[in-house]
Design a protein with these regions (language model features):
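Extended basic (Lys/Arg/His-rich) segments that typically form rRNA-contacting surfaces
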Residues: 1-224
């Protein structure tokens, strides 16, 4: 498994050798610094902690700075842990760049969806409006009946309702990498990824076998 931290730059399009337009999301991937290395002997599993994006020291707490100073790493805004196949080969202070992936790799991209604030059931869950005529009632954007009265005298869990919409962790699986620019630390993946421009994303090797989504392609039983 390979992984890297990045930021969503935006969407664009690339033409393949047949002139077909491929919608892609451009991600600024890395460079990331190995901040901590976890081993089976000490922690019970193999993993590395990556740090991404330099920030001023004054923006971190003393415990955070102590953790980074112990590793001899400059202040980082984001720290994330990954279970990597080559964790034993990496050492604290090593740099992970976009070229850890190559064109044709399949990845899972995790991000935070856009926030939409407090929304009603129609926008949040796609509920149907009540009739606007023929006795449709005084309100037309409510959820309608939520269940019985005396029995069970409560609303079952899972019923839709108004509330905060968005700002959820979302993972899009089996996106293939169309292009990698190692000099600019940019990765272009086919399709859309969660979050706004500038949003933090985690790119990891896909964990599932899959069927390639686009046309004129075969089936991959072991993508990595």
């Amino acid at each position: 498994m390979k992984a890297i931290i990045g930021k969503k730059v935006g969407m664009s399009q690339i033409f393949d050798e047949n002139g077909k337009v491929i919608p892609v999301t451009v991600i600024e991937a890395g460079p990331c610094t190995v901040v901590q290395k976890k081993t089976s002997d000490k922690e019970g599993y193999e993993a590395v902690q990556l740090g991404y994006e330099d920030i001023p020291e004054r923006k971190l707490s003393k415990p955070e700075m102590g953790h980074l100073n112990k590793a001899g790493v400059a202040p980082k805004k984001y720290l994330r842990e990954f279970n990597l196949d080559n964790a034993a080969e990496l050492n604290v202070g090593d740099i992970v760049k976009a070229d850890t992936f190559k064109e044709g790799d399949f990845v899972d991209v995790t991000g935070t969806s856009k926030g939409h604030g407090y929304q009603g059931v129609i926008k949040r869950w796609g509920a149907q409006r009540t009739p606007t005529s023929h006795g449709g009632g005084p309100v037309h954007r409510h959820a309608g009946s939520m269940g019985s009265t005396t029995d069970p005298s409560r609303i079952f869990k899972g019923k839709i309702g108004a509330g905060q919409m968005g700002v959820d962790q979302v993972t899009i699986q089996n996106l293939d990498i169309v292009k990698v620019d190692a000099d600019l630390n940019l990765i272009a993946v086919r399709g859309a990824v969660p979050g706004p421009k500038g949003g933090l994303v985690l790119i990891k090797s896909t964990v599932k076998t899959h069927r390639v989504k686009h046309a004129d392609s075969g089936i991959s039983n072991n993508p990595q």
